[in-house]
């Protein structure tokens, strides 16, 4: 029972990304608009489990490290909303900004609690142990839904009712990244013994091309980019362990992938949909034939940013001025706080990525941090809002907590 609860707690980090797969596994079909109550119930339930479990652990066990600043981050966000509501009459709980504020409470606050707990009690084993279970559950759901995807007449058709082509591609790429990281890192710490057996090793190798193919079949462009970035980053980090074997493995994986997709028109069309932003050898992140609404939003954002380029329009009032989030983290940051906020954001992100790299170089048992941080880094370039993205907050808070420890360790070396 304890292990099941721990799995549910870790799933809180990615529940927004995988909920459509969980619904499909239990046979629930829902409309994304009409079924919003079901989604809200699921998210609130996982948030409650996560916060309740962390509080219980904190009360019953003595922490190895003392740190409180992440809780002040939560208080600052709450304070900023109510402060802006005093100056901007449209910033209310009933407004679009208010809804995003509530989503911050449901999505971000629980994982901030969890990241702080993991650091304070040295419990990264929670992530290492449960990440591959989540990967297997999601892969199973994706494989079971391949017939539905292949019979779809439009890339907009989803699975489980709510998972569209973007969700399918992103989730498949995320599963691929978790799987490849476990294989190449050769990490055995904190993992269940059954998953270290030769049988599961063969299964994991077999799943890699399947996960990559489903990512392409989904037709999501961001997911395709996540797949490529994950492959490149994981190969770069872990090829030093055994470059020859890694190179041969990579070649075989690519050959298997190319051979399979070459026999199906559906995979070919998915491939074309996934990479149709590749124009003239460059990636166009702004103009997108299939994303007219997002292109219009981004064109609108340039005007809004130009109205207040230095200090922006406010963390929450910026959402009111823009009417929506921009599906791009840098545009959202510029609208909220202008160049000043963007500078602070860059400084923080530089520290996050530098700490992540140092952790991966020195702690093989924490290898699972790599796929967890690549996912939101790619996703937030194309979709979603960073303030309500649980993966973004979890990775940012956790790596910042570890930053001082690993900076000092590198200096001693």
Task: List the predicted regions and their residue ranges.
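N-terminal signal-anchor transmembrane segment
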Residues: 1-59, 76-87, 144-145, 376, ...
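A juxtamembrane structural motif centered on a specific transmembrane helix
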Residues: 1-7, 192, 199-202, 361-366, ...
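Hydrophobic, aromatic-rich transmembrane alpha-helices
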Residues: 3-10, 45-60, 175-193, 339-359
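Aromatic-anchored transmembrane helix interface
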Residues: 39-46, 67-82, 91-117, 129-139
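Alpha-helical transmembrane segments of multi-pass inner-membrane proteins
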Residues: 125-153, 163-238, 374
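Long extracytoplasmic/lumenal interhelical loops at the membrane interface
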Residues: 152-159, 282-337, 356
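Flexible juxtamembrane loops connecting transmembrane helices in multi-pass membrane enzymes
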Residues: 249, 261-296, 320-321
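Hydrophobic transmembrane alpha-helices and their immediate junctions
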Residues: 337-377, 396, 403-410
């Amino acid at each position: 029972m304890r292990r099941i609860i721990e799995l549910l707690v870790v799933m809180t980090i990615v529940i927004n990304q995988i909920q459509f797969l969980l619904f499909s596994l239990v046979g629930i079909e829902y409309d994304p608009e009409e079924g919003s109550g079901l989604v809200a119930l699921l998210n609130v339930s996982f948030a409650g489990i996560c916060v309740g479990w962390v509080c219980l652990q904190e009360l019953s066990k003595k922490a190895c490290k003392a740190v409180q600043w992440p809780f002040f981050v939560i208080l600052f966000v709450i304070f900023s909303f109510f402060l802006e509501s005093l100056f901007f009459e449209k910033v209310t709980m009933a407004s679009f900004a208010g809804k995003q504020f509530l989503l911050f409470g449901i999505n971000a606050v629980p994982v901030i609690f969890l990241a702080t707990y993991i650091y304070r009690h040295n419990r990264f084993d929670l992530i290492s142990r449960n990440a591959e279970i989540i990967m297997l559950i999601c892969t199973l759901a994706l494989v079971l839904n391949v017939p539905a995807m292949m019979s779809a007449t439009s890339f907009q058709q989803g699975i489980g009712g709510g998972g569209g082509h973007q969700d399918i591609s992103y989730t498949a790429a995320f599963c691929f990244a978790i799987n490849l990281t476990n294989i190449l890192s050769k990490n055995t710490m904190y993992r269940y013994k059954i998953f270290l057996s030769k049988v599961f090793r063969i299964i994991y190798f077999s799943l890699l091309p399947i996960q990559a193919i489903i990512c392409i079949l989904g037709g999501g462009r961001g997911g395709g980019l996540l797949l490529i970035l994950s492959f490149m980053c994981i190969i770069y980090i872990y090829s030093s362990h055994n470059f020859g074997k890694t190179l041969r493995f990579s070649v075989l994986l690519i050959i298997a992938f190319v051979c399979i997709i070459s026999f199906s028109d559906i995979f070919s069309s998915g491939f074309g949909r996934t990479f149709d932003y590749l124009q003239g050898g460059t990636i166009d992140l702004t103009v997108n034939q299939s994303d007219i609404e997002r292109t219009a939003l981004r064109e609108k954002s340039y005007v809004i940013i130009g109205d207040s380029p230095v200090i922006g329009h406010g963390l929450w009032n910026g959402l009111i001025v823009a009417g929506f989030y921009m599906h791009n983290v840098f545009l959202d940051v510029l609208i909220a706080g202008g160049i000043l906020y963007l500078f602070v954001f860059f400084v923080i992100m530089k520290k996050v990525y530098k700490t992540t790299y140092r952790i991966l170089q020195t702690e093989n048992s924490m290898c699972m941090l790599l796929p967890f941080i690549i996912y939101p880094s790619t996703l937030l370039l194309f979709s979603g809002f960073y303030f309500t993205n649980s993966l973004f907050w979890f990775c940012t808070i956790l790596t910042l907590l570890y930053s001082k420890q690993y900076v000092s360790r590198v200096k001693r070396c």
